Amino acid sequence: IKKITTSAFTLPFVPAFARVSANQPGSSYQGPVLRVAIMGLGSYGTRVADAMQSCKMAKLVGVISGTPSKVKDWQSKYNIPEKNCYNYENFDAIKNNPDIDAVYVITPNGLHKGQVIRVAQAGKHAICEKPMALDAKEGQEMVDACKKAKVKLLVGYRMHFEVKTLEIIRMRKENELGKILFFQGLCGFRIGDPTQWRLNYKLAGGG
């Protein structure tokens, strides 16, 4: 999604399976469109949904949430039909909905494994927000479930699609950097609400 993630998740995903062509007024793009249901309607899910409004290769068509009031708000804001709205108890029924191609899981880290596996078992492609899982074992179980169901699995990460990252890769491949002896990467963010799930080890894992 260009405004927040360079629309990266749609690029390797869409050609493989999307069945609907774009017909947005004023858009020159007439290729396949990925029809996405977002699971998890929190702050980041909202940012994704807002950014998707300008996407050409993906469209928000459904929601999955445990908060009925949020579902109603999103229905009104994004024009989502009732038949494409689910909660965490009944979203397995999404397998019978031909209008949804994929589910973007944007929930606390500790919930990813179980939710992605259920998405796969429902026959829908899965986009999972980073980090994919709490550990490698969980991640492998998710991969295995998607392979078994013959659906795609993509982690919602964007840096390998960014211009600066691609340039560094090019420089390395063309030996412009010489012999690399040391690399250090640093990243930080404000903790914010001390009661948030990101500070809960069971939900966030390593954070």
Q: What is each model feature region?
A:
Residues 84-145:
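Beta-loop-alpha module in the N-terminal Rossmann-like domain of NAD(P)-dependent dehydrogenases
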Residues 111, 131, 155-161:
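Rossmann-like NAD(P)(H) cofactor-binding subdomain of soluble oxidoreductases
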Residues 3-28, 32:
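Structured beta-strand/loop patches that form or line metal/cofactor-binding pockets in enzymes
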Residues 22-80:
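N-terminal Rossmann-like dinucleotide-binding module
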Residues 57, 84, 99, 176-179:
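Glycine-centered tight turns that cap/initiate beta-strands
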